[in-house]
Curated annotation (Swiss-Prot):
The modification N6-(pyridoxal phosphate)lysine is found at K380. Residues 22-81, 667-687 are annotated as: Disordered. This is Tyrosine decarboxylase. InterPro entries: Aromatic_deC, PyrdxlP-dep_de-COase, PyrdxlP-dep_Trfase, PyrdxlP-dep_Trfase_major, PyrdxlP-dep_Trfase_small, Pyridoxal-P_BS. SUPFAM superfamilies: PLP-dependent transferases. Disruption phenotype: Mutants almost completely lack tyramine, have fewer eggs in the uterus and are hyperactive in egg laying in the presence of food with most eggs being laid at the 1-8 cell stage. They also have a reduced backing response, show more spontaneous reversals and fail to suppress head oscillations upon anterior touch. It is found in: Cytoplasm; Cell projection, Axon; Perikaryon.
Amino acid sequence: MVYGLGEALKNLNSYCQERTTRIRNSLSPSRPSMSEATATGSSSSSRASTTIPSTPNMDVTPTVEDPRQNDNNASGMTRDEFRQYGKETVDYIVDYLENIQKRRVVPAIEPGYLKDLIPSEAPNTPESFESVMEDFEKLIMPGITHWQHPRFHAYFPAGNSFPSIIADMLSDAIGCVGFSWAACPAMTELELIMLDWFGKMIGLPAEFLPLTENGKGGGVIQSSASECNFVTLLAARFEVMKELRQRFPFVEEGLLLSKLIAYCSKEAHSSVEKACMIGMVKLRILETDSKFRLRGDTLRNAIQEDRNLGLIPFFVSTTLGTTSCCSFDVLSEIGPICKENELWLHVDAAYSGSAFICPEFRPLMNGIEYAMSFNTNPNKWLLINFDCSTMWVRDRFKLTQALVVDPLYLQHSWMDKSIDYRHWGIPLSRRFRSLKLWFVIRMYGIDGLQKYIREHVRLAKKMETLLRADAKFEIVNEVIMGLVCFRMKGDDELNQTLLTRLNASGRIHMVPASLGDRFVIRFCVCAENATDKDIEVAYEIIAQATQHVLHDSVKAVIAEEDEEAVALEEMVADLNITETPEKCLTRQNSANAAESGQKLERQLSKEEILAQKQHESLAKKRSFLVRMVSDPKCYNPKIVRHLNMANHRKMSQDLYRDRTLMQTISHSQRPNRLSQSPGSAGSAFFDDDDDRIVADVQTGLQTPI
């Protein structure tokens, strides 16, 4: 066996020497080969009895062509092309943002529009940048909802600014993945400093700041507020489970977990509910006061009730600036209760948190000193592109102990002196998000950012004033920041019609919410450079659409009355009754009541049952956005028309059903009803037996025998 291995190594050595000789000969043809050099050495030295191969000269380096110099299309884009196309793209971005008001706010397309426009297979050969950009404008842009449009007033702002775009370009060019300090030291350290800067800007207590001397607090940038809510819930769950395992070492963890219960208000973001679902803990959704705020007494009573049931309260998620109406839970009441009961208090200020850089808004977070964690989204209201959600914790060790996974290949020699942000969230890979926060804060300054926030609040107040001055509208929320919730004075159906008409026009975009079981329309100031003119134009669009809705509703009522009269007349004619429709209905109802002794109850349709259940559940659950931007019914006229046609068909079917029921009732009241057979004249009222059977079942009458 040893002999075989030695022979193999000898053969391998000979092969390597031969390959070295060939390479040297191909690079330097004039230089003598290894065998020639060996022969020369033998003739000049009589003492050499054997031929000794010379050591290969390894200073000869093959000249490898730089692939970046390759000018063929296989490289995707050369450096010179990138310079050219990069400048063209910057020009395109500037032109797009300058002229965005000329575009529809929402696209006039239907779901699946792109599938038939893009080939089903990827191209085998490279395509030019010009071709790709042409298709981008022709195929992609028609399907874009323009969040930077001056009349985009849905949801909350999507932060955007030129400094942030440039910072993202640099981050993408660097292309680092900063899961640890060693993976990219500058990324980790800049994030640490930016969380300290921003925390001071919004007035967080020093216990939360990363650079507080001898402090336990810390900050991290997550991908979204949803992730912030989730990781804080996991940290709170880990903390309480650790204590429960010590107190009840022989109880199964699954049983302990089933006893945990968290709390939030009905106006809290849906991500709290999702976090509890994933975390496998119960969630109790609490009622709010008349201003849609969670109060301390409500929480205290819920905690006591659940403890009486054997449950273990452990987590409370509060909101400063709710999604539906920008209301503020009362932290000064909730905080002491959480401290008294040793509950983890989390504060979600995704939208409003950026406004706390203005001192006049900081009283809204009185009680923050009781919180264990806090998050806000600069990518909403601080001119920073998505994604950038900042989160702080009072004790960073309670967060990281719930998330630490430390395989060998991720360890490094500086772990005891640095922060590894991979232990602060769900993903391992992390982007250089702090770079855009640094660029924006430096290039706007705190003064510039404060001016931006205050201008949005002023414009929201202006819209509130315009709507209050119009007798057709009412304001539903307390306008504190940049969100106005309003509705037409009337029923929910009118307001739904108004919103559908507004979004279908493509001139403005808003979304609804449900407040106090009422359908309301949300108007949020979103554009960076929004002006008084933009607000006035938005109000005029709303006012004009309202006039059309009111006019159409009056016409619809008149038309509906005419249709009912015609239907009754047709029914009378079919039944050969000479009385008026009103008298006919009265006589029929009286006779039916006398015969059966009970009133016939109209059976609810499937749609009506679902609507009733939704209405009942809405009073118990948190408010939600009824329709999202992905719902084409909000803005697509084609689908709106299709739905209207479907409703018309349903009305026609309902009318036919009612006529059939009336015929059945009338037929059942005739004296000779029992003497008639299915094939007799009594069956002449029905087109077929199925109609008669359905009518009999729905009216509760027996089929004639």
